[in-house]
Amino acid sequence: WSSDVCSSDLNLRAPSVIGIDTHVGGVMGVDAYYGRRAEILESWKKDIRELAKCQNVVVKLGGIGMCSFGFGFHDRDYPPTSEEVAEAWRIYVEPCIEAFGVDRCMFESNFPPDKQTCGYTECWNAFKIIAKNATATEKKALFSGTAARVYKLIAP
């Protein structure tokens, strides 16, 4: 993640090319960013809203299990539950969905890197928990439809 949103200029100049923002923008929560989540989150939300103005950009909702996000689950003696993961990740997933809409968002597992935080099952269950109030159409977009369209795949 970068506060200058430099990629948006490129996306505006090449509107026929689909830009993919991975890992919700790769927000850092360690090293120099540790303990500054609230400050960084507000700046990141502003940048996400700006990037979402580029109609050719989609965002992958995942990769949040990497240690660089700074949730600290990897430091515990026991793994987090799906509910704990959902609660932690929600602060990044929901603003992306609000800014981009479900037709420009797709859940991603990012395994094995996300394995640093939680298991594969907990990851996908966390996404289901986050999306529990979405309509069936919205869930289809988030879990398969957007990815199928962007990557030109045949969705079930």
What are these regions (language model features)?
Residues 1-7:
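Short, small-residue-biased leader/transition segments that mark boundaries at the very start
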Residues 5, 24, 109-111:
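Generic detector of well-ordered alpha-helical packing
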Residues 19-25, 57-61:
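Non-cysteine beta-strand/loop elements that form the S-adenosyl-L-methionine
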Residues 35-117:
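Active-site-adjacent C-terminal substructures of enzyme catalytic domains
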Residues 91-95, 99-106, 113-156:
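Mid-to-C-terminal alpha-helical segments outside catalytic/metal-binding sites
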